[in-house]
Each structure stands twice: as structure tokens, then as C-alpha cells.
């Protein structure tokens, strides 16, 4: 199930040089920028493994528009390789009857263990020492097969494409799916997860048959299909679902099932694209819409938004509410821009604390890190996954010193935002990303050609176990 992953690193010309390297003057490497630079005939981009602590790619058959990482009992803040993780994903098959929900157990996720990233650009001796440290890895010994993740899967039949799927944070075996048929269904996946946890061979290499299972709830009260759905992090079982007709329904747990309020929240004038419960107030949630607005609602105050504001000049595709700084809400638009707002400033006027126009295609996913309040990741239709640290600011003196030290090695673009921390490529038609809440620094992304698991090298210095004792 593995595949070769090619991502941004450096340009490689396939043409053989006729002269030896000693006869050719050293030419500084030029950073290749997607959307700005083009590849010439015979050139290709290749992955630079040193940019990652871990990088793996795999596919599961049909593409998956949406997935979620499942909470497990393997421990918090895990930093030791190899890693094990669980996830749920829904397919987008050619025929409605061929779709399924997959429960995945992924083991042997290998990677490198490094020392803390140096605070400054060191001298030659420091770099040599760092290189030696970088070569030390939990997984450097042995053949390539020993470094390949093992994937086990159990599949449950799902009629229609899965537009979005989410696992309840308090009970990750309970999942909800939004189907393109217009149905919202809640599932109990405990038997499948137990089977995966107890066996090393169950569903290995994707050989699991598609099983038939009835959902706990099958809600057909929406007037159209939808994508927006979110579980409450504060009240177990409380759920929201929003559709393409601009309506939002509230679900409340009731006697082992759910009671869905038949009267929807109404305030948007076009499709509701995403929903996010407040991480701090159990009765408050936010929504975004094709109408270009973001609305904040209080379920105690009726069916109209408590406040609403124009967020972008195009469709607002996705939002993410910062779990570590609950005043911060990020939004991503169809025009490729994304913004961060301080909700405390909404009523006073301009609440935008950051706005980025780096991406040139629609933003398809945005999510704050679960471990760093200033860090978030974004996916876009330009086939880039970018990671941003809002705490970073441009330091003219430091930048000049760095450029002086590296000018013979690399030509650094001058127009990159200082908050841009990492760019990952290699996937086509990126749809969604999630940070792993229990493995700091790990991101999983899904695209039209499969999944990637990545842990960028330059964010590893925030990991608890990597800090000096």
C-alpha cells in the first residue's frame, strides 16, 4: 500500500554533466516556489528526507474526501518511534454502492529521533555534529521493509460518497458521516476497532471484506446534502450538521440515541461549509458559508446568529477554532486566502490579526495545532500543505546575517511570509488534514491519490521529549 512520495526539496536535472564537479563552479541552490517557478524539460522535484522526522505515503483504494484520527489508549505526547495510530475514513467511489467507511490501524510508523534544532546557524564543527546526530535513528538499522508502515483495515458499507466523517472526541468509536445522498448517519465502530486492536493480521494489506452494519441513527431531515459537521468537545454526544441549503441542525444525545431538533438554525444565505464548536463555551458554535460570512451562535438564544461578519470576498470553505487560545478563529476561502481573527475584537471593528495570500487556489482544510497555540496547518487546491507559526516575525538583522552566511549555498526568496514554517508537496488534489492530538508534530493528510503521514523536522524542537533535561 505504500507509494513513493515526491515533495518540494531541490531541483534535479536529469541531464548528465560532461565536466567533473571539480571543474564546475558552485552555484547556489534556488528555492523552488510552486505557482511561481516552472519545471523545465528533464527536471523533476524530489523529496529531501532530511526535511522530515517521518514521512510515509499510502493509498486505500478509492480516494477519501474526509477522515479523522481516532483517540486511543496508547498514551499522550508520544515521541518514541515507531508509532501506532488509528483513523477512520470515508471513500469517494465511482458508484454509490461501492463506498465504505474504513477503520484503520497503522503500525510501524518509523522515523528519526534528533537533537533539538540549533538556535543559530552554527559553524562547520556544529554542523558536522548535527549531521552525525541526524543519522542516529530508531529505524536506521535494517532493510527498507522494516521501515514500511503496516496497515490493517476493517470496512463498513456506506451507501453514497462520504462527504465528511468525524469521530466523537470523548468516545472515538462513535463516528458520524455526511453522505452525498443527503443522510447523516451515526455509527458504533467499537467491534471493528476492538478486532484491529487485538490482532496483528486482521484486515492486513487491505484484504478485509466490506461488512454490512446498520447505523445507530439515520437522519434524513436535511433538504440537501452537506459537508459541515462537528462534535462538541465539551458535551459528549452533542452534534451539529449543516447542509447546502444553509440550514444547521442540533443533535442532542438521548437514551442511547439522538434527538435532532427539527427546527434548524437559519442565518446564512448559501451553503454552510463548516462548523466548529467553541472550545471554551459549551453552548457556542461558529459556522462559515458560501455567502462569504462567518457566524457565531449561542444555542440558548434562539435560531439566529449572535453575530455575523463578512470574512472573505469569496466562499468561506473551512474554519478552525483554536483549542489552546479560544479567542482565535481561523478561516480559509475559495480565493486561496486565509485569515485569523481575535473574536474579542469583533464588535469593536477590525478583528483580523493575520491575513495571508500565499496560496493561489482554494483553501480546502485548516487546523490549529493541538500542542502549539500559534501554529496551524493549511491545505490548498494548489497541492501544497503549509505550516505556519504566527509567533514568528521578520527580523531584518537576523535575516541579513543568515543571508550572508548562506548566500553561496542558497538563494532565498525575499517575499516569503516570515510565518511560513514548512511547505509539503507530493499529493494531488489535497482535501483534508489533521494533527495527531497524541503524537506532537504529526500531521496526516488525504488527497485524490492517497494519504501522507508527515512529521516536519523544523517543528520537532517543540516536542517535550526533545528538550534538554
Curated annotation (Swiss-Prot):
Region Disordered: what ranges? 1-29, 115-150
Enumerate the WD repeat regions by residue range: 157-197, 221-261, 267-307, 311-351, 358-398, 425-464
**Ranges of Basic residues composition bias in the record:** 1-15
State any GO CC term.
Cul4-RING E3 ubiquitin ligase complex
Zinc in keyword set:
no
Q: In which pathway does it act?
A: Protein modification; protein ubiquitination
Question: Locations of Acidic residues compositional bias?
Answer: 124-143
Assembly, per entry: Probable component of CULLIN4 (CUL4) RING ligase (CRL4) complexes. Interacts with DDB1A and DDB1B. Associates with HSP90-1.
Family under the similarity heading: Belongs to the WD repeat RBAP46/RBAP48/MSI1 family.
Function according to Swiss-Prot or TrEMBL: Probable substrate receptor of CRL4 E3 ligase complexes acting as negative regulators of thermotolerance by disturbing the action of HSP90-1 and by preventing the expression of heat-inducible genes (e.g. HSP14.7, HSP21, At2g03020 and WRKY28).
The protein in question is named Protein HEAT STRESS TOLERANT DWD 1
Species in which this protein is naturally found: Arabidopsis thaliana
